[in-house]
């Protein structure tokens, strides 16, 4: 695979290999055959970032080859959304011969939605001034004249200039209902929107017979907690990043959801609060004991759950675990499988043509 060529004819084979690999990894804990969810074979990534290479009068996107670190020129990127590909061409054309916009520009980040909105961030090794803003506004207007619904942001050390806004609103059809998700520039969002829809619908199906309340750790912008709210009486969710918490609060209102409470704190801190080890001012007015959480949802970073959180989640009858790293999932399962059985297993092909796998498990207490 090269950045400008996807081996789409090998899609089925690479997915089959992942299924075999996941089954092998999960064998000590379950003999279930994974439910498999396919990605679009191309144009599946909704975000991408590229370094910029200045070569005389020429200017182009590059990425670095992982092993050799050599530069690879990228004029098109079929893994990314069609809108990103359109913007890649339009941005180079708009910046190449503009001294103010081009000077010391070293990176461009693209964030797009299925609803055809985009935020493009230009990163610089220089101070940004009013002249930069004026030229950037002219470029933005030219892009919009090409029917590109785009917002531009300039970034430099300790500087961020938003011409309009630093977010876009994604609209996803999830099990017969449209979900609105505000996505903020430079914050985590699910990279593969089509796969995200399938993950949300799988999680909804896995929890459809649930009772009581849901607790979610690492909720981000509320991606899962808001979609799952329809299956539970109440949802209590934690997140540490301020922009994600703000986006989650917006998403609660935009989706007219009244049974979700977001708390800004780390999963480790929440574990301490639940266990009565520490009290936190930010939990004032929230009666943790009033929640009857029979299900806990975790979507941890690649490092998986820490040992204290492992112990905490074992107290719940049902654990829904989405993992972006099956190796750390299996490490966690060495502990969790002492009290819970794997009752559902899913493979989500979030990153086609790569070694990476995303998977989901539903664990039920013995």
From Swiss-Prot:
The keyword Transport does not apply. GO terms for biological process: tRNA methylation. The active site is at residues 324, 358. The keyword DNA damage does not apply. Transmembrane segments: none annotated. One of its GO terms (cellular component) is cytosol. GO terms for molecular function: rRNA binding; tRNA (uracil(54)-C5)-methyltransferase activity, S-adenosyl methionine-dependent; tRNA binding. S-adenosyl-L-methionine binds at residues 190, 218, 223, 239, 299. It catalyses: uridine(54) in tRNA + S-adenosyl-L-methionine = 5-methyluridine(54) in tRNA + S-adenosyl-L-homocysteine + H(+); uridine(341) in tmRNA + S-adenosyl-L-methionine = 5-methyluridine(341) in tmRNA + S-adenosyl-L-homocysteine + H(+). It comes from the Bacteria. Keywords: Methyltransferase, S-adenosyl-L-methionine, Transferase, tRNA processing. PROSITE patterns: SAM_MT_RNA_M5U, TRMA_1, TRMA_2. Its EC number is 2.1.1.-, 2.1.1.35. Belongs to the class I-like SAM-binding methyltransferase superfamily. RNA M5U methyltransferase family. TrmA subfamily. Dual-specificity methyltransferase that catalyzes the formation of 5-methyluridine at position 54 (m5U54) in all tRNAs, and that of position 341 (m5U341) in tmRNA (transfer-mRNA). HAMAP family: RNA_methyltr_TrmA. PANTHER family: TRNA/TMRNA (URACIL-C(5))-METHYLTRANSFERASE (PTHR47790), TRNA_TMRNA (URACIL-C(5))-METHYLTRANSFERASE (PTHR47790:SF2). This is tRNA/tmRNA (uracil-C(5))-methyltransferase. The gene is trmA.
